[in-house]
Curated annotation (Swiss-Prot):
Membrane protein topology class: Multi-pass membrane protein
Subcellular location: Membrane
Sequence ranges on the Cytoplasmic membrane side: 181-210
Residue intervals on the Extracellular side: 1-159, 232-297
Coiled coil: none
UniProt keyword list: Membrane, Transmembrane, Transmembrane helix
UniProt xrefs under PANTHER family: TRANSMEMBRANE PROTEIN 169 (PTHR31777:SF0)
Protein origin, superkingdom: Eukaryota
One Gene Ontology cellular component: membrane
Membrane spanning stretches: 160-180, 211-231
InterPro entries: TMEM169
Species in which this protein is naturally found: Mus musculus
Disulfide bonds: none
Name of the protein described by the UniProt record: Transmembrane protein 169
């Protein structure tokens, strides 16, 4: 009876199969943990947003509330600095190699907060940055040269005209859809203004008319803008065609809201950038090897 205890203890020793199973389970858990960390790293390596708009606060607000900005939320200017200066958790931003982030200063001409100064942090490639910083004299001199004659080349000629004719129905459909979308948003914003912010007489007179005439108004506007965009994209050169084809809605909704005095109803805001002499001067003083993270227009 005394020798039975060690025999039982020897029978309880883990077999090699149990050890291999435990090692396999541990390996699976380790791989699962690595895959989870890999997924987290991929989430952290999300591409940086292409652009962000920072609204400049008034000097009176900044002078009256300095303590609140220190103890509470940070001002939007600091958020813009963090957007430019600090990378993600893994220390690397996922952005193209030939692009850089610059700060463009402009004024909102149409849309919400009209007349306010804004700082736009946007991604620009080297080519786009060179076009943006091109001096005015060069652009003015290049315009008459392009108008002298319809030159034929790889980027301009009859083949481009043929291509624009083929794309005419496609541009019409795309412009119709985009105009329908922005027009519906504009109509809804105008309806909310007359229904919630205006007087009772506006509510009983204008709101029913907006609802009744919505199908006619939206179809007329979308069809007209689609036809205009399809005709306007006919061009002799690729560059002019691309500029016209990318502008589907032609800024009609913003223009209409500004004419009606309802800038807040615009589905977008149009920002007019300041002169590009500052950024061209800053880049000319820098070495080509040196990277420019922030520039001012």
């Amino acid at each position: 009876m005394e020798e039975s205890a060690p025999v039982e203890s020897q029978g309880q020793l883990p077999s090699p199969h149990h050890g291999s199973l435990r090692r396999a389970v541990a390996a699976v858990l380790a791989l699962d943990g690595e895959s989870t960390l890999g997924r987290r790293k991929k989430r952290r390596k999300d591409s940086r947003p292409e652009s962000i708009i920072i609204y400049r606060s008034d000097n009176e607000k900044t002078d009256e509330e300095p303590e609140e900005s220190e103890g509470g939320d940070r001002p939007k200017e600091e958020e813009g600095e963090d957007f430019l200066d600090y990378p993600g958790d893994d220390g690397v931003w996922n952005m193209p190699l030939d692009s850089r982030y610059v700060t463009l200063t402009g004024t909102i001409t149409r849309g919400k907060k009209k007349g306010q100064m804004v700082d736009i942090h946007v991604t620009l490639t080297e080519k786009e940055l060179q076009e943006l910083t091109k001096p005015k004299e060069l652009s003015r001199e290049a315009a008459p040269e392009g108008r002298r004659a319809c030159q034929v080349g790889a980027d301009q000629g009859p083949h481009v005209v043929l291509w624009t004719l083929v794309c005419l129905p496609v541009v019409f459909v795309l412009s119709f859809v985009v105009s329908f979308y922005y027009g519906t948003i504009t109509w809804y914003n105008i309806f909310l203004v007359y229904n919630e912010e205006r007087t009772f007489w506006h509510k009983i007179s204008c709101c029913p008319c907006l609802i009744l005439f919505y199908p006619v108004l939206i179809m007329t506007m979308a069809s007209s803008l689609g036809l205009y965009a399809a005709v306007a994209q006919l061009s002799w050169s690729w560059a002019a065609w691309w500029r016209a084809a990318c502008d589907m809605e032609k800024g009609f909704c913003g223009w209409l809201c500004s004419k009606l005095g309802l800038e807040d109803c615009s589905p977008y805001s149009i920002v007019e950038l300041l002169e590009s002499d500052n950024i061209s001067g800053n880049l000319s003083n820098k070495d080509p090897i040196q990277e420019v993270e922030t520039s001012t227009v």
